[in-house]
Amino acid sequence: MTERVQVGGLQVAKVLFDFVNNEAIPGTGVSADSFWTGAEAVINDLAPKNKALLAKRDDLQAKINGWHQARAGQAHDAAAYKAFLEEIGYLLPEAEDFQAGTQNVDDEIARMAGPQLVVPVMNARFALNASNARWGSLYDALYGTDVISEEGGAEKGKGYNKVRGDKVIAFARAFLDEAAPLESGSHVDATSYSVKNGALVVALKNGSETGLKNAGQFLAFQGDAAKPQAVLLKHNGLHFEIQIDPSSPIGQTDAAGVKDVLMEAALTTIMDCEDSVAAVDADDKVVIYRNWLGLMKGNLAEEVSKGGTTFTRTMNPDRVYTGADGSELTLHGRSLLFVRNVGHLMTNDAILDKHGNEVPEGIQDGLFTSLIAIHNLNGNTSRKNSRTGSVYIVKPKMHGPEEAAFTNELFGRVEDVLGLPRNTLKVGIMDEERRTTVNLKACIKAAKDRVVFINTGFLDRTGDEIHTSMEAGAVVRKGAMKSEKWIGAYENNNVDVGLATGLQGKAQIGKGMWAMPDLMAAMLEQKIGHPLAGANTAWVPSPTAATLHALHYHKVDVFARQAELAKRTPASVDDILTIPLAPNTNWTAEEIKNEVDNNAQGILGYVVRWIDQGVGCSKVPDINDVGLMEDRATLRISSQLLANWLRHGVISQEQVVESLKRMAVVVDRQNASDPSYRPMAPDFDDNVAFQAALELVVEGTKQPNGYTEPVLHRRRREFKAKNGL
């Protein structure tokens, strides 16, 4: 039983109450009494509104299901369907024109373009690594990944391979020639870098000296001007450093003593309380809030063991240079942090209201993550986050403008409880639900003075696409979904609406995740598509990926690209509403088996770690042993696709069960080296994780909007209770 403290009409889990009063509040200037009194009023007033919004979701879904059921066997009538969506209030009239009014936004969001990390804040080591991923070694990112081929004797091996190292150096020099070209000659032929009279001087191997073609790209240096340790350059708004140390192992092999190129990489990071974590009770939530507190106070630390040595990882300090004019120049040493709260769906028993009901988790997150952020606003920190006095909160999984307006209201109420100026709390709107996509302009308008981010999350969005049209017929295979008409229109619409509502210079327009952290050569080739599509940020799965994705923002001037895109014909809502139905379902038995096995394996690989180990985001080997980043969004697609095929008779429940059992053996094998792993086979009936995976598919049509959280949370609590955790 959870030990509770009565606070007014609230029953608060003691572990949360003690954390808030003893750790979160001291140093904020907020009194415990006023906080809890204010929190209770917010909960009493807004929890019923939250509940009503969820009821509306269910009502609209029931009406859409009924419409499709009444037309079973008939060809889809797109015009009648659109008229029906308008009639039931799903598709609203377009909002009148407006411009976002957000103020006090940091440059990393408003005026720069670069990669964005998303990490589970429940994991302190991941959180620290991401915070410190503002700057990343290009040499390490190239040497350690498949960007540099192993052909011609360039294998990674255990020790340093000079053949491979030389390929890395050549790649980096080519980057320097592209991003910071010399007035004459090439960085390839540089023999030294020095600073004279406030300018960068580059000596070449032919004995001549030259400078930068654009002298203004040189900003600053570290060390002695005649023999600097680092030279700071800027291109397309992003910084990078040529690091020089002729005595270092790499510098010794370089004619100019260059040991590395340090890239400004993850400009921003989302510290995630949502899809990448497994938090089901007060104990779990306190782990999340405590790590967020450490980030906001600048004192988060973690013991890390590497290569037999143990050290303490902390948040990096700012970077200090001597500017070209001789004055001191300081650059932010860390990624600018957002915090992603949970959406409106789930409740959590960390707090019970005056009626004994669990309180919506999104309201709890809003109160506690904002309270904690005050430490960073008022200077009670050694590591400043926002320099403009803002708190950046990503709000996921909102359905339509009423829900965005509810978030705006919640944030206003939280500001009042905490004594913060209006619109201190900024909002990032995830465009990952169909009703938000088709009403995106109105959603932004509902939070127009807070909005700092819109982002397409195509994974969740695909899950909602399938569930919304569950009764319309069988959908295409998962791999074919990306080439369906709706998805291109959805991606373009996000950029079109963002630019039309004045987000440029005030907010990020973002794109989704590269989900294959080991396939960096493919990412380098393909992910340039995101800045070319007008996104001034896009998600990456690791600090290394952030360093490499930064190269794309040197190749593409995103803000110039946005100016071009603003002139195109906006995406069509009719295209967005095109349901991804399979034109026919005469797949071969082998094709069906492969699709079912692939999805079943992904579901099990993710769910078993979620339920048994409380891991909400992990690199899960797929059926071909390719590591894929999985979180609840990928689980939502896989489970909904199988539920859809089951609903329309493409597959039987027996096929699902048989595939899950076979794939459980595969997943067990893939996890055999993990000493804490509990095999699912052969005791399937008594294995909580296996039963959770099965339930997600066979009961998939009944899950609210296809979300996986209700099943996962219930089953994780069952596992914890069963094992005394």
Curated annotation (Swiss-Prot):
Cofactor list: Mg(2+)
GO BP terms, alphabetized: glyoxylate catabolic process; glyoxylate cycle; tricarboxylic acid cycle
Gene3D superfamilies the UniProt entry points to: Malate synthase, domain 3, Malate synthase, domain III
UniProt KW RNA-binding keyword: no
Catalytic activity: glyoxylate + acetyl-CoA + H2O = (S)-malate + CoA + H(+)
Binding site for glyoxylate: R340, E432, G457, F458, L459, D460
Pfam families assigned to the protein according to its UniProt record, in alphabetical order: MS_C, MS_N, MS_TIM-barrel, MSG_insertion
Residues bound to acetyl-CoA: V118, R125, F126, S276, R313, P541
Binding locations of Mg(2+): E432, D460
Subcellular compartments: Cytoplasm
Residue positions of the active site: R340 (proton acceptor), D631 (proton donor)
Record HAMAP family: Malate_synth_G (MF_00641)
Protein name: Malate synthase G
Species whose genome carries this gene: Pseudomonas paraeruginosa (strain DSM 24068 / PA7) (Pseudomonas aeruginosa (strain PA7))
Gene name per UniProt: glcB
